[in-house]
UniProtKB/Swiss-Prot annotation:
CDD domains reported in the protein's UniProt record: GH16_XET
Signal peptide bounds: 1-21
Stated family: Belongs to the glycosyl hydrolase 16 family. XTH group 1 subfamily.
GO biological process: one example: cellulose metabolic process
Superkingdom of the source species: Eukaryota
Keywords: Apoplast, Cell wall, Cell wall biogenesis/degradation, Disulfide bond, Glycoprotein, Glycosidase, Hydrolase, Secreted, Signal, Transferase
Protein name: Xyloglucan endotransglucosylase/hydrolase protein 3
Stored InterPro entries: Beta-glucanase/XTH (IPR044791), Beta_glucanase (IPR008264), ConA-like_dom_sf (IPR013320), GH16 (IPR000757), XET_C (IPR010713), XTH (IPR016455)
């Protein structure tokens, strides 16, 4: 059976369904903003370059520093997307991250992390969640494309019902808000960064950054979001749970049938680590794994 052909058909079908639903079905369309409209540089000022009137941002990593930026506003729900091209070449130990995170103790966080590699080995995409300061919910994927070659769209849907990690509009991970399961409860900002993670990121920390290949450059553009801005209100994200927000409405409370097929295919073919099945970490899997 030609799985890639089937996969391609699913991709096209899902893309058509998502466009049709958002434009003609009233589900809403993400708002595109320039970098300066919605983001500020948070660290590594000299290692951040804004291009094309704020439509693209490059982060640079060398031995002196990496760089990062965050949204000016915090949100209590929404759909957040960026198109990203991660550093190429011998990037072992280098981490490119796009994530939502709260501030202060016991933080919540929803992560995309690209783990660099050397000698032509593929970059790993790691997803993770921190809930009230507790992480260790990693799932890792070797993608069906090379994320260093072209821009691809990475999206995070967060609403009162589920968190969905999207790659090019394909759901690769779903975390459901079910009874007894920890779930984000704090306002979160959108962040991106490029940093040295060579104590863990590649080969369990055995591969260190080879600085002779620096600078490493991560590219970001098409800053799309539709979110419930919680700034100026209570820190209670309950204010952002209304179904009047299109990303909280019925069509976003669960995967569609086509999304479910894509989700199952990606996980069976491209996921190479799941914390739920790691008995060295959890003798009894966490509640959300059932």
């Amino acid at each position: 059976m030609d799985y890639m052909r089937i996969f391609s058909v699913f991709v096209v079908t899902l893309w058509i369904i998502r466009v049709d639903a958002r434009v003609f079905g009233g589900r809403g369309i993400e708002k595109f903003v320039t970098f300066g409209q919605n983001y500020i540089v948070t660290w590594g000022q000299s290692h951040v370059s804004t291009l094309h009137s704020g439509e693209e941002v490059d982060l640079y990593m060398d031995q002196s520093s990496g760089g990062g930026f965050e949204s000016k506003d915090a949100y209590g729900s929404g759909l957040f997307e960026m198109r990203i091209k991660v550093p190429s070449g011998n990037t072992g130990g280098i981490v490119t991250a796009f994530y939502l995170t709260s501030k202060g103790g016991g933080h919540d966080e929803i992560d995309f992390e690209f783990l660099g590699n050397n000698n032509g080995k593929p970059v790993t995409l790691q997803t993770n969640l921190f809930l009230n300061g507790e992480g260790n919910r990693e799932e890792r994927f070797l993608l069906w494309f090379n994320p260093t070659k072209h821009y691809h769209t990475y999206g995070l849907l967060w609403n009162p019902y589920q968190i969905v990690f999207y790659v090019d509009n394909i759901p690769i991970r779903v975390y459901k808000n079910e009874n007894g399961v920890s779930y984000p409860s704090k306002p979160m900002q959108v962040e991106a960064s490029l940093w040295n993670g060579d104590d863990w990121a590649t080969d369990g920390g055995r591969t260190k950054v080879n600085w002779s290949y620096s600078p490493f450059i991560a590219h970001f553009r098409d800053f799309a979001l539709s979110g419930c801005n919680i700034d100026g209100r209570s820190n209670n994200v309950g204010a952002c749970e209304s179904s009047n927000y299109w990303w909280n409405a019925g069509n976003y409370q669960r995967l569609s049938g086509n999304e479910q097929k894509l989700y199952e295919h990606v996980r069976s073919k491209y996921m190479n680590y799941d914390y739920c099945t790691d008995r060295s970490k959890y003798q009894t899997p966490p509640r959300e794994c059932y």
